UniProtKB/Swiss-Prot annotation:
This is Argininosuccinate lyase. SUPFAM superfamilies: L-aspartase-like (SSF48557). It is an enzyme of class 4 (lyase). One of its GO terms (molecular function) is argininosuccinate lyase activity. Gene3D superfamilies: Fumarase/aspartase (C-terminal domain), Fumarase/aspartase (Central domain), Fumarase/aspartase (N-terminal domain). It comes from Methanoculleus marisnigri (strain ATCC 35101 / DSM 1498 / JR1). InterPro entries: Arg_succ_lyase_C, Argininosuccinate_lyase, Fumarase/histidase_N, Fumarate_lyase_fam, Fumarate_lyase_N, L-Aspartase-like.
Length: 492
């Protein structure tokens, strides 16, 4: 049975199974096993390029690494007696090519810079995947919005009927939020995109490594500028978790409204059966389970963020084993976000919105009262606060008809709106929810023309974000393909 080579120098004795399990990071290490092989290959090419390792051990090691890359890291390397996959893999390599060859791969390197590099590689891939999903979600929102620019519905504040708007205007509000999430993740990617490799434990190394060369092989924009910060920093991970948590907060809000809207007493939307479940006892039930679970996932991602911040808040420079406990929270958080966003896109794209039901609710709760007050200002010259008081008093009396408004004007401001020229026909026209929407034709407003402009502008931004994600993904995968090609040439 292979043993942990790292313990055989300074430490003696055997550990109990409970202690091995407590210290091991194997579950999280499965996320970085492939990235770790890429790091090994880049490091080995760097050692050879600088003349630090001879050709014979370098070729033997590269052949063994390529075999692992092609066929997978053996399960034994994930045994908890090794603490982590790095030690398990090193034991495998030494067993395969001998210690004289296998024991040379770790020259000029520590697990500290090795794992930090692996995490950044995988996190870059996760960011790109999340960005691609956000691009698809935003496209869905824009497409659905484009079909509902004239679908009038109630808008809410405090969950009370407030003012009429359109379904397109509502959906575009969420598209704007997810657009900002995209921007945040793009910015975070730039801070993740630096290579710690070559920083060793924290004080770099006396071996003449070319850190820019290995950074390029691994698809990084540059090497990290300070070797201590390179291994100690996890703020980049916290930043991505924060971005994912903000994104999932918007997701949760949207899911909450889909749950509410799909109820029988609201009836604004019918979710596709694929995104719902039934009851084991109540045969009529159609429960919006996907939206509910997604709503809860937002809490899970926020929990991962809180855990990551708490784990790192009191750590001294530079590397501390506490950071091992952060990594599972990082993977769980980004995975929950990455899984949720495509499902939300599918749920929205397959949903059926009831335009008639929305229109019927659009004028309830005196939702056009604001427009009536505005008309008293724009067309009859009243101060807004006076108009606000008159309309509010009429609402208190239970009606916005001419007689009630006249009584409210005399009661609240001691004058006559009838004498100003207000008519029953004017009131009826103003209180039409479609009128209230149509006159709000300014930048960002719900009028069809304003909404069309928003859709056009956001489609242009979406196209740029989509191109960036595709180009970045292509560049990263291209770097990995080039690395594997160089590794195969080297081993041949």
């Amino acid at each position: 049975m292979r043993s942990d080579q790292i313990r055989q120098g300074r430490l003696a004795g055997e550990r109990s199974g409970d202690l091995e399990h407590f210290l091991a990071s194997m579950d999280a290490d499965r996320w970085i096993a492939r990235a770790d092989l890429l790091v090994d290959m880049a490091h080995l090419l760097g050692l050879s390029r600088q003349g630090i390792i001879d050709e014979a051990p370098a070729r033997a090691l590269m052949a063994a690494l390529l075999d692992l890359y092609d066929h997978g890291v053996p399960e034994e390397a994930f045994d908890e007696r090794f603490e982590d996959v790095h030690a398990g893999k090193e034991a495998y390599l030494i067993d395969r090519v001998g210690e004289d060859f296998g024991g040379r791969l770790h020259m000029g390197r520590s697990r500290n810079d090795e794992v930090a590099t692996c995490i950044r590689i995988r996190l870059k891939e996760e960011i790109i995947a999340l960005l691609r999903s956000l691009v698809d979600l935003r496209a869905t929102l824009l497409d659905v919005a484009a079909g509902h620019t004239g679908t009038v519905m109630p808008g809410f504040t405090h969950l009370q009927h407030a003012q009429p708007t359109t379904l397109a205007h509502y959906l575009l509000a969420y598209e704007q939020a997810f657009s900002r999430d995209t921007a945040r993740l793009r910015e975070a990617y730039a801070r993740v995109d630096v290579s710690p490799l070559g920083s060793a434990a924290f004080a770099s190394t006396g071996f003449p490594l070319d850190r820019a060369y290995t950074a390029s092989l691994l698809g990084f924009s540059r090497p990290a500028g300070n070797s201590m910060d390179a291994v100690a920093a996890r703020d980049f991970a916290i930043e991505v978790l924060a971005d994912a948590s903000i994104c999932m907060t918007s997701t949760s809000r949207l899911c909450e409204e889909l749950v509410l809207w799909s109820t029988a007493f609201v009836g604004f939307v019918r979710l596709d059966d694929a995104y719902c479940s039934s009851s084991s006892i109540m045969p009529q039930k159609k429960n919006p389970d996907v939206a509910e679970i997604m709503r809860a996932k937002a809490g899970s991602v926020a929990g991962s963020l809180a855990a990551a911040i708490t784990i790192t808040k009191g750590l001294p420079m530079s590397y501390n084993r506490d950071l091992q406990e952060l990594t599972p929270h990082l993977w769980r958080g980004v995975e929950a976000a990455r899984q949720s966003i495509p499902l939300l896109s599918g749920m929205l794209g397959s949903a059926t919105f009831d335009a008639e039901r929305m229109a019927a609710e659009a004028g309830r709760g005196f939702s056009t009262a604001t427009e009536l007050a505005d008309v008293l200002v724009r067309e009859y010259g009243l101060p807004f606060r006076t108009a606000h008081r008159i309309v509010g008093r009429a609402v208190r009396h239970g009606s916005l008809d001419l007689a009630t408004l006249e009584a409210a004007a005399r009661e609240a401001a001691d004058f006559s709106v009838v004498e100003l020229g207000l008519t029953r026909e004017k009131i009826d026209a103003v209180l039409d929810p479609r009128h209230a929407v149509a006159v709000r034709n300014i930048v960002g407003g719900p009028a069809p023309e304003a909404v069309a402009a928003q859709i056009s502008e956001q489609r242009n931004l979406l196209a740029r974000d989509k191109a960036w994600a595709e180009e970045t993904e292509s560049a990263l995968s291209g770097a990995f393909e080039h690395l594997i090609l160089e590794a195969r040439r080297f081993a041949a």
